[in-house]
């Protein structure tokens, strides 16, 4: 596994002390290697790994199965940010006192999306950021690396980045022209639903937009920062309409530009 030196050292200590937690929560961005890290844990404890669904029915099925297994088994709940409260509550008792051969791993983007009672019963591992040297070991395209923060980012198609860059430049042009119509026309290219795979990823757009905005100081004011920060934070929440959040931010930035001229 690339990077994650401190987390790997933690695993080694667990193994040496024979103290691998029975319930682990792995927190990190999509593409940061959470599932890969979970597989490293499973291999370390020599367990069978099973990826489970997050519905209440599948959680109950997991619990029933956990009490009948006869060999070490690790149940993985991926992207549990969106797991319903009923399902999380159903897990509480079994993760507090796991059956003899059962281990449980949850992966989440934001640990704050977990119930406090769930967090208190688990051991949290936070995925570490990757250095440019680590990312360069799997990708040698400087344009891709410019916008890569994790391993998954290095696997993006160059065409996707170029399309996103064009969208960003269209938005910048709209801000310069002080035209809300041009800005909103450009944002029609952004993905508003997960199923719209042919459209531009909102988080990638935001990353490239903030980078490009630095070259246009006339388009932001000290007051603009709060809108950028707010939108960046909102994009980390799984329940938010990311496209709408970006559009709201851009309208606010446009208002700031217009007010500067008055």
Question: PLM features: residue spans?
Answer:
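Short glycine-centered, acidic/aromatic-flanked micro-motifs in structured strand/loop junctions
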Residues: 28, 77-79
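Conserved catalytic/switch belt of AAA+ P-loop NTPases
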Residues: 67, 88-106, 116
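Conserved alpha-helical scaffold flanking the Walker A/P-loop in AAA+ ATPase domains
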Residues: 9-15, 55-74, 81-82, 86-94
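Charged, glycine-rich active-site and insertion segments that engage polyanionic ligands
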Residues: 1-46, 100-102, 109-262
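Conserved phosphate-coordination/catalytic loops
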Residues: 2-5, 53-57
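Conserved catalytic segments around the Walker B and adjacent sensor/switch elements
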Residues: 44-54
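Structural motif
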Residues: 74-76, 105
């Amino acid at each position: 596994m690339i990077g994650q030196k401190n987390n790997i050292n933690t695993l080694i200590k667990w193994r040496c002390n024979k103290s691998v937690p029975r319930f682990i929560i792995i927190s990190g961005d999509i593409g940061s290697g959470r599932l890969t890290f979970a597989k490293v844990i499973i291999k370390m404890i020599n367990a069978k790994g099973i990826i489970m669904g997050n519905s209440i029915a599948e959680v109950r099925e997991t619990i029933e199965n956990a009490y009948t297994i006869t060999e070490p088994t690790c149940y993985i709940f991926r992207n549990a940010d969106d797991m319903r409260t009923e399902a999380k509550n159903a897990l509480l008792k079994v993760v507090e006192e796991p059956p003899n051969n059962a281990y449980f791993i949850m992966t989440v983007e934001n640990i704050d999306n977990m119930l406090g009672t769930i967090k208190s019963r688990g051991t949290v591992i936070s995925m570490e950021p990757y250095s440019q040297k680590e990312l360069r070991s799997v990708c040698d395209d400087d344009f891709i690396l410019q916008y890569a923060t994790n391993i998954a980012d290095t696997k993006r198609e160059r065409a996707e980045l170029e399309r996103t860059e064009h969208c960003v430049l269209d938005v910048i042009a709209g801000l310069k022209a002080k035209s809300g119509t041009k800005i909103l026309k450009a944002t029609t290219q952004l993905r508003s639903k997960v199923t719209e795979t042919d459209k531009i990823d909102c988080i990638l757009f935001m990353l490239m937009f903030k980078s490009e905005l630095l070259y246009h100081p006339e388009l932001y004011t000290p007051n603009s920062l709060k809108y950028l920060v707010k939108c960046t934070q909102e994009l980390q929440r799984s329940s938010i309409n990311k496209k709408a959040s970006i559009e709201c931010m851009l309208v606010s930035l446009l208002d700031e530009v217009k007010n500067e001229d008055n």
